């Protein structure tokens, strides 16, 4: 029996029948809002509630984050889906997404840090997708302005300094139409042990010429504007030298995205994203160590290789210098094979921090196989103290078990960083709003929409 949401069915999850008491209580108490808001709340609010419950968030924090999500985030998602084709294709989750304006991440945690959750969103508004707002800036600006009255820890000064350098502006109508598309995304971090909600911004220039100039001119100029003319650019210059002069570095392609934290300027990261075609482990290890400038222990490199091989189904004696074979019948898009990285080039770091991103659709047989591989790896290496298997309950709340076992698509990436000799792993996944359109309608409403609706 489905629960009632102010007289309307709350719906059921596709594969996890365990109750969500805090979410259910809020559904009974909060204002209904518009039909569009109710759709997004019933879907994404339930997902968020499941994530926080499984991650062991304190009850008061669950309430706080859910109320913030309902009244600050949900209204930015725009019209609910009317078909399997999005009315506006968001850049959230990039090529792994289905056009929905939200995705999620689950950080499994390390010995000294509990699991925690982020949402990644692209606010949508009345001008989104129109000639008046070709890069969907207006809704994001309105959202950020709203947050300044809500989040006392929010500091947007670095974002507003970087934004004019990194967001493309076109005076010519033909160029505006040619390069129309999302240019800014927002990350919403919900830590379990904090009363703050942290905001991250991701900027993407639409003009390809700008992407090629990011490291050489655009980001250095933005950093001088933000930090002063005497800002230390050592980390940036190390990455630039690696990409320019090292054989493995020259294989990296800038993705165009620059990520920054909306906190005190001196504490913010500046993340520069790249990707590669080369899937050999030797290449991946070289990129992670920046050509040996940021050395990793043999133990850590062995763990990285073990995880990479297991995700790809490779035997333990597979040569580290060889490319991962493309599976028979597996179709891969042109360009990189699903391995990306970011370098944190903030001024206070003598050496950049590095994180790798592994595309699940290109490096795993199924969503469940990928999740089981990562969870078993964490348990085997003594990182099971935060119950990583709780993540499976989150996936089952989004996608039925049979789909998890046979398909890829619910998960976008796994990221891997190194923290104190441990692998710090995060899963990135999407709510399947459009990819599972018909099923989502059944789960939320209890009946299929008419094909003519």
From Swiss-Prot:
BP GO terms, sorted: alkaloid metabolic process; secondary metabolite biosynthetic process
Pathway(s) annotated for this protein in UniProt: Secondary metabolite biosynthesis
Keyword Transcription: no
MF GO annotations: prenyltransferase activity
Enzyme Commission identifier(s): 2.5.1.-
Enzyme class: transferase
Record flagged with keyword Transferase: yes
Function: Prenyltransferase; part of the gene cluster that mediates the biosynthesis of neosartoricin, a prenylated anthracenone that exhibits T-cell antiproliferative activity, suggestive of a physiological role as an immunosuppressive agent. The non-reducing polyketide synthase nscA probably synthesizes and cyclizes the decaketide backbone. The hydrolase nscB then mediates the product release through hydrolysis followed by spontaneous decarboxylation. The prenyltransferase nscD catalyzes the addition of the dimethylallyl group to the aromatic C5.
Protein name: Prenyltransferase nscD
Organism listed in the record: Aspergillus fumigatus (strain ATCC MYA-4609 / CBS 101355 / FGSC A1100 / Af293) (Neosartorya fumigata)
Gene: nscD
């Amino acid at each position: 029996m489905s629960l009632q949401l102010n007289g309307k069915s709350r719906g059921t999850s596709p594969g996890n029948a365990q109750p969500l008491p805090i979410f259910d209580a809020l559904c009974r108490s909060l204002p209904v809002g518009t039909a569009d808001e109710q759709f997004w709340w019933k879907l994404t609010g339930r997902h968020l509630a499941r994530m926080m419950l499984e991650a062991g968030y304190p009850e008061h924090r669950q309430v706080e984050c859910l109320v913030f999500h309902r009244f600050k985030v949900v209204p930015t998602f725009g019209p609910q889906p009317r078909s399997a084709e999005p009315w506006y294709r968001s850049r959230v989750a990039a090529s792994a997404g289905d056009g929905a304006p939200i995705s999620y991440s689950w950080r499994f945690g390390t010995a000294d840090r509990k699991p925690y959750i982020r949402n990644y969103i692209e606010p949508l508004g009345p001008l989104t997708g129109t000639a008046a707002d070709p890069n969907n800036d207006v809704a994001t600006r309105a959202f950020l302005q709203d947050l300044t009255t809500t989040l006392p820890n929010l500091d947007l000064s670095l974002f507003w300094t970087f934004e004019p350098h990194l967001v493309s502006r076109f005076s010519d109508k033909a160029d505006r139409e040619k390069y129309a598309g999302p240019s800014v995304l927002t990350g919403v971090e919900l830590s379990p042990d904090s009363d703050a909600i942290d905001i991250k911004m991701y900027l993407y220039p639409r003009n390809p010429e700008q992407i090629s100039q990011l490291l050489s001119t655009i980001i250095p100029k933005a950093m001088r504007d933000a930090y002063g003319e005497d800002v230390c650019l050592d980390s940036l210059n190390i990455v630039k030298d690696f990409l320019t002069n090292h054989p493995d570095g020259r294989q990296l392609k800038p993705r165009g995205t620059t990520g920054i934290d909306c906190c005190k300027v001196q504490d913010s990261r500046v993340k520069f994203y790249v990707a590669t075609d080369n899937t050999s482990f030797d290449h991946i290890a070289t990129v992670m160590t920046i050509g040996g400038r940021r050395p990793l222990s043999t133990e850590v490199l062995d763990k990285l290789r073990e995880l990479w091989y297991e995700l790809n189904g490779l035997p333990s004696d597979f040569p580290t210098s060889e490319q991962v074979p493309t599976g028979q019948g597996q179709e891969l898009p042109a360009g990189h094979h699903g391995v990306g990285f970011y370098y944190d080039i903030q001024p206070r770091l003598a050496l950049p921090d590095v994180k790798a991103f592994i595309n699940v659709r290109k490096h795993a047989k199924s969503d469940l196989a990928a999740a089981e591989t990562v969870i078993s790896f964490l348990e085997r290496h003594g990182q099971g103290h935060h119950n990583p298997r709780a993540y499976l309950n989150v996936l089952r709340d989004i996608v039925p078990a049979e789909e998890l076992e046979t398909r890829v698509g619910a998960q976008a990436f796994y990221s891997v960083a190194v923290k104190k000799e441990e692998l710090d792993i995060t899963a990135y996944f999407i709510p399947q709003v459009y990819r599972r359109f018909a099923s989502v309608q059944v789960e939320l409403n209890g009946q299929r929409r008419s094909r003519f609706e």
